[in-house]
Amino acid sequence: MAAEGERQNLLSKHLERQVKILQSICKNDSEACNLLDLGYILEKNLFAPADSRKADSGPDPQLNFFPPFLTPECLALHYPFFLTTSIPPSCKGNRSGTDTYSQFCSRSSCLEDIPDPSEWDDSLGNVSLMAELKENQKLAPLEEDSPRTTAVDESKCSSKQSYSYPALTFPPQVQKILFDYLIGESQDPNDLDSEYKLAFTDEDLPQEGQAEKTKQRETLGAVATFGAVLLSIQRLFTHPVVIKNTQESLHYTFLHGFVRMVHLLTEVNLSEFVTFHGLTHRNRLNNPVQHRQLEGADRFDYILDTIYLYLVFAWQTAMDIWSQTIDEETERNLRERVKSLKPELAGANYAEACSLVSNTVFPPLLREALVVNIPDFVNQTQLANFRLFINNKSNVPASVCPALPSDFIPLTYEESHPVLWAHVMLLRLAAFLLNHGQYVQAPDESSISLPLCDCNLCAPHRMPCYNPMLLNEILSIGKFEVRGPDTEGKGFSLTPQVFANAYMEKFYSEDFHPHQVVLYKDDKAQFKTEPTAAVIREPKLLALIRESQTRREKSILKRGGGRYLDPQTGEVLGESSHGIGEELQDGPSYGEKPSHDLPSYGKQNPVAGRGLQAAGERVRRDAGSPSQPTEQLGRRTPQRGGTGRDKRGRGRGGRSATPDPRQETAEKESLQGTRRESS
């Protein structure tokens, strides 16, 4: 009751503050009540008030903001559990130049078998040391180390013994049930002298001899501690839809591939959009291209670590969603189901027991529900803060020590203690996703003639260099307008926003290889679907538009010499078929134009969601295209409903960003493209 009263009190204070703000606005601004954009009113009066004098009627509600750069505690409440243990000598930081590291970096498949937990050795192994190790030194300076890892091993972390790994477990309620029925009932910390009750007594186990019974108890303890959750993680993250969604989200995170192409054509930065529990947020303070400033091993390590943290964050988000749905009745039913497994578990081996427990506590129905809702769109700033949070918990001062969380994780199961196998799995999956998404190979320059990405999401269908019809369509953006016989009827023009919405839906599941690295540039025979344009699917119509455009430009040039400017746009005719095709840079010069000055889509803003179904329907209505959308792997249409305790995780994308009405006119003018040719 006390907690309920406290929540009501906090809600009352919040509502009281909002009422004070609105009352003060309506009193001082006569136009406020007539305006429809409440967000603009609050922005105008909170961040740029006309009268900044101090009020005499108590604390100013406008100044009740969260302290800058202070991490909110609600972030820690998301999943604040850590596993603090000794750093294994076989960690990634001690494997430079070894065959294990080379095989790890070139991973081309995400499907693998998990060995028996009794087969492991996390010793340093055969490595080329630069100097003799000190007593209890965990990180060894190696001859093949990069400058970053050398700094970490030799000076910054030479005496570090342990690290805090973010927890990769089931929700606490589920984990406690497994411990109670597979290991033994939890003891009261104040009553440790009482007799400990084992989950499986000697009479419950069919094995002969005390040694065999003890071994079976250890096996079931391993299943409860890490075996069942390890199998559940593997089943979730190797699901084809999750791999597709993860790669799509990582393209947003790194402004990579087709997301980079949209930015090149429309100057809209989709990496500003992030999602969490079904709501879409826009944050303009993110820098999505900082990884392009790195080279060699540093670039590989940074991208690998970012993807690893992304997977950790995705699993913890899924467990957070699941945890909130577990009520007393659900917990009671789960206890009964796990208890009913005991006769089968008593005689099962490790693999069989893991499968039984995982199928019970993490059934296919739950897995399918999570598949369509994770992972979220996450930007690099979020993951950088997550990295800092983990290092702070591990006593690693990030300002002077360039250590990454992935440096402390072994590369194979055989070289790791089983309690870290979940981290080994996610790190190995991160290496596969890195190669599968071609993030390290991204070019520094941006041009429609360059392969910005060779992954299955982009090549060949979304890359103009591999898709001639798509290239012709891009060169026709803003170059024509089609009208019907009725002059007052609605016409069609291929605008950047119409093209972008259709372009982002351009995905063919039959050409997507989720479990293997199959690149179009290396093996074209593996791709069956013929590349087409995004909006104008009829090749003859597209060719006619391009021919008409070229013929008109040649006709203009025949009238005389010199340079001819388009009277509407000022474009130099005859020098470039379309301004979009020019070589543009968005690498080191990304920060020359602040992201908040970039034009948005106005009323057709692209949503950072899976497949952009709603946007695609709008494109087809505008274009009048009879083509049907292709069947896609991905999520359901983003929901616009609330996200209360009973609704969290049900929708994707949520609300799209609302454009600023003060910039709407300028945005429309900036997206007009070049001149239009009437029929």
UniProtKB/Swiss-Prot annotation:
Family the UniProt entry places it in: Belongs to the adenoviridae shutoff protein family.
Post-translational modification: Might be cleaved by the viral protease. Phosphorylated. Tyrosine phosphorylation enhances preferential binding to tripartite leader mRNAs and allows ribosome shunting.
Induction note: Expressed in the late phase of the viral replicative cycle.
Subcellular location: Host cytoplasm
Disordered: region residues: 552-679
Cellular component annotations (GO), alphabetically ordered: host cell; host cell cytoplasm
Name of protein: Shutoff protein
